[in-house]
């Protein structure tokens, strides 16, 4: 397919002719698209279409599994992440990820946030405390945990744990934040808080979200990509994708006739 371009501005992430394999299985086929900076881009599509796989390629999580490989280009500010010789840990500091299930570390709320910061920066105690508070405020969690920072992160509710994970991700000040179905295990109230947070975060970060909830994609995202069986079927402004899709396959999925 041709490269999907949605804006004339320079993209934060440019994917060019990306193919991905699980062993011999061809999971992503010739994906090309440009993800705009300081916007929320949502990936939708049926289970197994390649949404989460693509997300994991963005910060090379797949390299943890030797049978998986990627071919093509993923450019972050013009640098191909797939061939970069930089430390992968530094890459993942720039391209943070929050997973479907909340994964607080087995440590205090404070240390959950401070852990990553200590890996990449040498801050004095005051600056570290300020960074932790800043991240928790950004994640709309400070007011709920400021008096119990020494308690275990696992003591929080599911929605609070997910916001803790988001705070942990942004504490190291990444440029891109990847969210893999961040609300799938949460109740409606917690989901609403996460959605509000996603909308606010784009002022500081480029946000990419995978979701099965099409209403969530419509509410939160500026751009939407529809994927099916490893192919990028359509990519454009969210309003256009939902109300004036150019492909029948996209319309069928969004209207519930397929999926």
Swiss-Prot record:
A Pfam family: ABC_tran
Gene Ontology MF terms: ATP binding; ATP hydrolysis activity; ATPase-coupled phosphate ion transmembrane transporter activity
Locations listed in the record: Cell inner membrane
One GO CC term, this protein: plasma membrane
Reaction catalyzed: phosphate(out) + ATP + H2O = ADP + 2 phosphate(in) + H(+)
Keywords of this entry: ATP-binding, Cell inner membrane, Cell membrane, Membrane, Nucleotide-binding, Phosphate transport, Translocase, Transport
Residues reported in the UniProt entry to bind ATP: 45-52
Domain ABC transporter: 13-254
Function of the molecule: Part of the ABC transporter complex PstSACB involved in phosphate import. Responsible for energy coupling to the transport system.
Family under the similarity heading: Belongs to the ABC transporter superfamily. Phosphate importer (TC 3.A.1.7) family.
UniProt subunit comment: The complex is composed of two ATP-binding proteins (PstB), two transmembrane proteins (PstC and PstA) and a solute-binding protein (PstS).
Name this protein carries in UniProt: Phosphate import ATP-binding protein PstB
Organism per entry: Albidiferax ferrireducens (strain ATCC BAA-621 / DSM 15236 / T118)
């Amino acid at each position: 397919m041709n490269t999907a371009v949605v804006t004339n501005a320079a993209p934060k992430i440019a994917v060019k002719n990306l193919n991905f394999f699980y062993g011999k299985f061809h999971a992503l086929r010739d994906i090309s698209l440009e993800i705009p900076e300081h916007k929320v881009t949502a990936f939708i599509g049926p289970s197994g279409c390649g949404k989460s796989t693509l997300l994991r390629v963005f910060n090379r999580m797949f390299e943890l599994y030797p049978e998986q490989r990627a071919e093509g280009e993923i450019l972050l500010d013009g640098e191909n992440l797939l061939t970069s010789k930089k430390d992968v840990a530094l890459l993942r500091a720039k391209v943070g990820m929050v997973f479907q299930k909340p994964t607080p570390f087995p440590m205090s709320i404070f240390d959950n946030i401070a852990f990553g910061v200590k890996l990449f920066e040498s801050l004095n105690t005051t600056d570290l405390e300020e960074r932790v508070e800043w991240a928790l405020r950004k994640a709309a969690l400070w007011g709920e945990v400021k008096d119990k920072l020494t308690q275990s992160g696992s003591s929080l509710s599911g929605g609070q744990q997910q916001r803790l994970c988001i705070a942990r991700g942004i504490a190291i000040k990444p440029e891109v934040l990847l969210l893999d179905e961040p609300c799938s295990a949460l109740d409606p109230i917690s989901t609403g808080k996460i959605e509000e947070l996603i909308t606010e975060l784009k002022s500081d970060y480029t946000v990419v979200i995978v979701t099965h909830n099409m209403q969530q994609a419509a509410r939160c995202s500026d751009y939407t990509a529809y994927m099916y069986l490893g192919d990028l079927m359509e990519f454009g402004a969210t309003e256009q994708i939902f109300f004036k899709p150019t492909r029948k396959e996209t319309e069928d999925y969004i209207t519930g006739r397929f999926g």
